[in-house]
């Protein structure tokens, strides 16, 4: 990706050359973050009083910047040690900081070292669009959207349904923290704020350091009750807001297929027993994901062990399947590939394979053209993969090749699936029952299966 922010150090913090403004307050930025966003949204109290049937709290931020608000929330959330609850944090950033710049900025906040170190250690090669980062064993999930905020958040709007009937859980809280409206108007546009409203519900709150009259007016027009309060430090004022449940927003004009529109999410009770049939890589990863969310999990496998059949591959390549065409499936493949390269990093460190990179070669002239088009389409993501030619290609491969070009993915590699599966069930203490899944019976009255 080549749209990283141009920065320089000024007065003890990072300064944006493009927006001619500081990424954080020149003094006491952490206290400002706590005051403007945590305190004014009453987050600590809301987190402590989360209902038993609500397993996640979702924050949306416009303007991730150096991630100080995220780290501050992350630290406070972890200190509360809420069992089987997740903090899910969506943030947009059009021009992200380079990793080295992020390290410099975080270095000014020693109290955030523990959370900062984990973020920096798992910080992926960013790609345009959605970048999913899981921290602290799934207790915190960050979705960093590298795009204009209006474009990024619009992709979370499923259909004509509003957040109360859609299967997307509405945001609990919004942080509006882009560069000032005069310097970066797209981060405060009426179109963006309409999307913020569409992704909100009657329990949603919002805060911003800005108290601009246009911002107040636009929020009010989109269904928010807006209040002005004292700003942090020497700032005269800021705003807080809460969403009104009865506000009528215009229908969204990009509905999904009928089968998605009619979908109603199933609500599970916590501590429910779930049996995963099959102990392959998919079964093990699903079991772990559900275990992290507080369910009692058992794996049922006819061999009484994991990774015996198709997942018994000791040299499985994390293989990319990208497309030169723009589609939801192509975007999903890129997101999944980037997430997988980050997710398996831990296992590579445990010697369950090797992150040696993956080089994909074309099999025909047609595929060469496809590779070229893929490179053009994802041209901003050269840190994640690169189209190589001739001498460079030969140097990476370490041998002579007949192909004249190839797509190289430096963060991919090969994996020992049996080792990974065994490590997962051991780490998360997931029992395995040796049995075939005979006699499955659906109990309609209980919406469950009998094995």
Task: Show which residues each predicted segment covers.
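Class I SAM-dependent methyltransferase Rossmann-like catalytic core
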Residues: 2-7, 11-57, 68-80
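The AdoMet/dcAdoMet-binding core of the Class I SAM-like
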Residues: 50-171, 190
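Helix-loop-beta segment of a Rossmann-like dinucleotide-binding subdomain
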Residues: 113-116, 324-325, 350-360, 390-425
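A short glycine-rich, Lys/Arg-flanked "PGG" loop and its adjoining helix->strand segment in the class I
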Residues: 189-202
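N-terminal Rossmann-like FAD-binding beta1-loop-alpha1 element of flavoenzymes
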Residues: 271-299
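Glycine-rich FAD pyrophosphate-binding loop
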Residues: 292-312
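Dinucleotide-binding Rossmann-like beta1-alpha1 core, especially the glycine-rich loop
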Residues: 315-396
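A conserved short coil-to-beta-strand element within the FAD-binding core of flavoproteins
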Residues: 433-449
């Amino acid at each position: 990706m080549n749209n990283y922010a141009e920065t320089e150090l000024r007065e003890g913090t990072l300064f944006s050359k493009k927006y001619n403004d500081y990424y954080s307050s020149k003094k006491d930025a952490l206290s400002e973050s706590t005051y403007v966003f945590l305190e004014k949204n009453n987050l600590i109290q809301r987190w402590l009083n989360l209902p038993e049937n609500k397993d996640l709290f979702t924050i949306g931020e416009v303007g991730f910047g150096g991630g100080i608000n995220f780290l501050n929330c992350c630290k406070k959330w972890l200190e509360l040690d809420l069992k089987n609850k997740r903090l899910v944090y969506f943030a947009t950033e059009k021009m992200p900081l380079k990793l080295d710049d992020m390290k410099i900025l975080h270095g000014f906040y020693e109290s955030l070292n523990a959370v900062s170190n984990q973020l920096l250690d798992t910080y992926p090669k960013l790609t345009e669009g959605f970048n999913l980062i899981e921290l602290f064993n799934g207790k915190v999930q960050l979705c960093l959207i590298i795009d204009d905020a209006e474009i990024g958040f619009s992709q979370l709007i499923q259909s004509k349904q509003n957040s109360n009937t859609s299967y997307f859980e509405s945001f609990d809280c919004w942080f509006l923290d882009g560069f000032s409206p005069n310097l970066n108007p797209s981060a405060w546009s009426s179109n963006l704020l309409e999307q913020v409203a569409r992704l909100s519900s009657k329990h949603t709150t919002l805060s911003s350091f800005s108290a601009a009259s246009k911002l107040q007016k636009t929020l009010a027009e989109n269904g928010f009750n807006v209040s002005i309060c004292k700003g942090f430090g020497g700032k005269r004022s800021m705003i807080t807001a809460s969403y009104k449940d009865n506000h009528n927003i215009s229908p969204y004009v990009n509905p999904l297929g009928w089968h998605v529109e009619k979908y109603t999410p199933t609500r599970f009770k916590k501590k429910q027993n779930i049996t995963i049939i099959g102990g392959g890589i998919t079964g093990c990863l699903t079991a772990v994901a559900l275990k992290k969310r507080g369910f009692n999990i058992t794996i049922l496998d006819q061999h009484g062990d994991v990774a015996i059949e198709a997942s018994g591959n000791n040299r499985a390549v994390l293989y990319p399947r990208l497309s030169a065409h723009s589609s939801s499936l192509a975007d999903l493949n890129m997101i999944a590939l980037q997430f997988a390269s980050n997710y398996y990093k831990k296992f590579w460190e445990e010697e369950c394979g090797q992150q040696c990179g993956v080089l994909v070669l074309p099999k025909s002239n047609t595929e060469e053209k496809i590779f070229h088009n893929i490179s053009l389409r994802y041209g901003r993501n050269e840190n994640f993969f690169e189209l190589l030619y001739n001498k460079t290609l030969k140097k990476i491969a370490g041998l002579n090749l007949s192909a004249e070009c190839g797509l190289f993915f430096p963060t991919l590699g090969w994996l020992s699936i049996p080792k990974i599966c065994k490590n997962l069930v051991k780490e998360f203490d997931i029992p395995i029952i040796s049995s075939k899944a005979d006699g499955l019976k659906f109990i309609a009255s209980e919406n469950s299966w009998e094995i």
